[in-house]
Amino acid sequence: RQRQMCIRDSPYRAPKDYRKQALASVTTHDLPPTAGYLNFAHVKLREELHLLSEPVEAFAASAMAERTAMMNRLVENGYISQTVADDVEGHVQEIVEAMHAMLTDTPSLLLQAALVDGVGECRSQNQPGTSREYSNWRVPLADSSGHVVHTDEVFDLPRVQSLAAVMRREKR
């Protein structure tokens, strides 16, 4: 449940509170892609795989509270408008980019953007706690529409280019 941008039990850290000698990222291979996090794909997957140690309603409520805390942080710091925060599903790419923009405002010397966030993938590449229950590391990379993305076309995708511009601080 922990996002890389947060302190273990929330609230989310302000960008200025990150350590300089650190690698900062929005997600990792053990967490859902950010688009999946925003649309609760991780809740559905963990329920399907029977990985929850609490009722799905409680886990879903916790996930909603985490997402709301992140939207509040993004709004408070001017990365998105309240209108965008109120319509997450309609603004996934904008929010993913805003989360990465917030990352670029940290003092951390190393920043990481996940390829899955660049293409808009929602499915987890790895699900900790599974071996045969989930196709870890065998999930084909796909875009937000579910179309497979081949490695030779990744950097031609407008969405990847847009996220790269955010990471280079060219886009705000």
Language-model features, listed with the residues they occupy:
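Hydrophobic faces of well-ordered beta-strands that scaffold small-molecule active sites
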Residues: 1, 24-27, 111-113
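Non-catalytic regulatory appendages
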Residues: 16-19
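Short conserved micro-motifs at the rims of enzyme active sites and ligand-binding pockets
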Residues: 10-14, 34-45, 49, 122-126, ...
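Short, small-residue-biased leader/transition segments that mark boundaries at the very start
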Residues: 2-7
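A glycine-rich beta-turn/hairpin centered on an aromatic-Pro dipeptide
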Residues: 56-113, 119
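A structural signal for the main folded, soluble domain(s) of proteins
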Residues: 1, 125-130, 144, 166-171
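Short, solvent-exposed loop/turn segments at secondary-structure junctions
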Residues: 8, 30-32, 116-120, 146-147
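Conserved, mostly hydrophobic/aromatic
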Residues: 29, 137
